[in-house]
Amino acid sequence: MSNATKFGKVAVLLGGKSAERAVSLDSGQAVLDALLRSGVQAEAFDPQDRSVTELVNYDRAFIVLHGRGGEDGQIQGVLEWLNIPYTGTGVQGSAIGMDKVKTKQIWQGSDLPTAPYRIITKETDLDSVIAELGLPVIIKPVHEGSSVGMSKVEKAEDFAAAIEKATQHDAVVMAEKWITGREFTISFLNGQPLPVIRLQPPADVAFYDYEAKYQRNDVEYGIPCGLSETEEKKLQALCLRAFQAVGAEGWGRIDAMQDEQGNFWLLEVNTVPGMTSHSLVPKAAKAVGYSFDELCVAILEQTLEGTA
C-alpha cells in the first residue's frame, strides 16, 4: 500500500496484564500481521514487558488491549498525555464502557432498554434479589470482558457459588435479569453500525461465554441475522444511540437480546472488541466487503482525523 507511510511508526498494543491477556495476544498478532501486509511500519508493544513511556518513539497506536489497563481508559490516558493518536474510544468513554453498572445507568438515563439488575455486596439479601429479578439471572463481574467470571443461575441454591466465582475476578459483582430469546451483536466501524450478526451457541452452552467466544468452533453466526429489514434497522439505530450515549467512538461492538415478545434489550458495550479468527467485528465487516487487512487499516485511519 503506497500511502501506508502516512501512518508513520505504529505501536500495536497487545497483551497487557488483564484476565483477557491471551485473547489480546491473539488479536494483536492478527492486527500486526494485517498492518505489515498492508505496508504499515508496525511493531508489537506489550505493556507488561515494556514501560509505556517508550511509546514516545511511535507516531500512533493501535489499541488491541482487552480488559483492564487497556479498555478502561488507562492506556488511553497515557497516550493522551504523550500526545499520541490512538484507535477507538477516548478516556471517558472507555472508563464508562468497562463498567457494566455505569453503562447501564447511562442507558437507563437515556431511556434506552437494558435488563434490570442489582449490585451484589456481602450485605445483599439474595432472597430480595430473586424477588426483584426472578430466576434465572446472570451473575457478572462489573469490570471484566469476554464473559470472564460470568454464570447463569437458575436455582437459588446456586447463587452463592456464582457470586464466589465472579468475586475471584472483581470486587464489584452484579446480578442481571436473564432475558430469554435471541442474542445479536452489532459492530461499529467509523462510528456507524455494520450488519447485525445473530449468535447461536450450541445447545449445551447456557450463553455466549468465554469458551464459546474463543475456543469452540460450533457456534453459529447468522449473517443475515434473521430479522426483517425493518427490525434490523431498528436494532442498528438503537445500538447506535447506545454506542454514542456512553461516549464510544470509531469502532466497537454492542451485544443485545430480543426477548420472546420481540422487544430489544441492550446487554453491554465493548470498546476494544476481539480481532481473532473467531471475532465478530471482522465477520460483520466482511459482510460489507472489507477484508481483514482492509478493516485494520480502516480502524487505524481514525487516528489521522484532525492531523491532516
From Swiss-Prot:
GO terms for biological process: cell wall organization; peptidoglycan biosynthetic process; regulation of cell shape. The keyword Nucleotide-binding applies. It is found in: Cytoplasm. GO terms for molecular function: ATP binding; D-alanine-D-alanine ligase activity; metal ion binding. ATP binds at residues 130-185. Its EC number is 6.3.2.4. GO terms for cellular component: cytosol. Residues 104-301 form the ATP-grasp domain. It is an enzyme of class 6 (ligase). Gene3D superfamilies: 3.40.50.20, ATP-grasp fold, B domain. It catalyses: 2 D-alanine + ATP = D-alanyl-D-alanine + ADP + phosphate + H(+). Its cofactor is Mg(2+); Mn(2+). The keyword ATP-binding applies. Pathway: Cell wall biogenesis; peptidoglycan biosynthesis. Keywords: ATP-binding, Cell shape, Cell wall biogenesis/degradation, Cytoplasm, Ligase, Magnesium, Manganese, Metal-binding, Nucleotide-binding, Peptidoglycan synthesis. Binds 2 magnesium or manganese ions per subunit. Mg(2+) 1 binds at residues 255, 268. Belongs to the D-alanine--D-alanine ligase family. Cell wall formation. This is D-alanine--D-alanine ligase. The gene is ddl.
